[in-house]
Amino acid sequence: MYVENSYLSKQLCFLFYVSSKEIIKKYTNYLKEYDLTYTGYIVLMAIENDEKLNIKKLGERVFLDSGTLTPLLKKLEKKDYVVRTREEKDERNLQISLTEQGKAIKSPLAEISVKVFNEFNISEREASDIINNLRNFVSKNFDYSDKK
């Protein structure tokens, strides 16, 4: 177990990096069954069952730009998890929605978070505190809707 009093162990960015990498590794083990990457997983989980979401709004939800989302959405469409349709009023706007298969896997995908949580040596209270602190950190410091 890594607990060290070194320069890196005191760096917020490094601790985020290690945590993110290791958590994603755990998710990846479960996502193989669905032929999904972690990024594909968060995109599917960000789309509500009966929602049509434009690519810009989806990107804001998951902090990804259209250059990253477009190839990912094409892969998800080939797997029959999402469908991409052009908006009638403005064909430049692409609408993303879940297919029946995409809706069907949302429940088992949501259970992955519970499975991953159970692999950690952490209480529900500690997890809740971390989530609240990180949500606060993200909301105070990052706004993906900002123009770059």
Swiss-Prot record:
<dbReference type="InterPro" id="IPR000835">
    <property type="entry name" value="HTH_MarR-typ"/>
</dbReference>
<dbReference type="InterPro" id="IPR036388">
    <property type="entry name" value="WH-like_DNA-bd_sf"/>
</dbReference>
<keyword id="KW-0963">Cytoplasm</keyword>
<feature type="DNA-binding region" description="H-T-H motif">
    <location>
        <begin position="55"/>
        <end position="78"/>
    </location>
</feature>
<dbReference type="GO" id="GO:0003700">
    <property type="term" value="F:DNA-binding transcription factor activity"/>
</dbReference>
<dbReference type="InterPro" id="IPR036390">
    <property type="entry name" value="WH_DNA-bd_sf"/>
</dbReference>
<keyword id="KW-0843">Virulence</keyword>
<protein>
    <recommendedName>
        <fullName>HTH-type transcriptional regulator SarZ</fullName>
    </recommendedName>
</protein>
<keyword id="KW-0804">Transcription</keyword>
<dbReference type="InterPro" id="IPR055166">
    <property type="entry name" value="Transc_reg_Sar_Rot_HTH"/>
</dbReference>
<comment type="similarity">
    <text>Belongs to the SarZ family.</text>
</comment>
<dbReference type="GO" id="GO:0006950">
    <property type="term" value="P:response to stress"/>
</dbReference>
<keyword id="KW-0805">Transcription regulation</keyword>
<dbReference type="GO" id="GO:0003677">
    <property type="term" value="F:DNA binding"/>
</dbReference>
<dbReference type="Pfam" id="PF22381">
    <property type="entry name" value="Staph_reg_Sar_Rot"/>
</dbReference>
<feature type="domain" description="HTH marR-type">
    <location>
        <begin position="9"/>
        <end position="139"/>
    </location>
</feature>
<dbReference type="GO" id="GO:0006355">
    <property type="term" value="P:regulation of DNA-templated transcription"/>
</dbReference>
<keyword id="KW-0010">Activator</keyword>
<dbReference type="GO" id="GO:0005737">
    <property type="term" value="C:cytoplasm"/>
</dbReference>
<keyword id="KW-0238">DNA-binding</keyword>
<comment type="function">
    <text>Activates transcription of virulence factors alpha- and beta hemolysin genes (hla and hlb). Also, activates RNAIII expression, a central regulator transcribed from the agr locus.</text>
</comment>
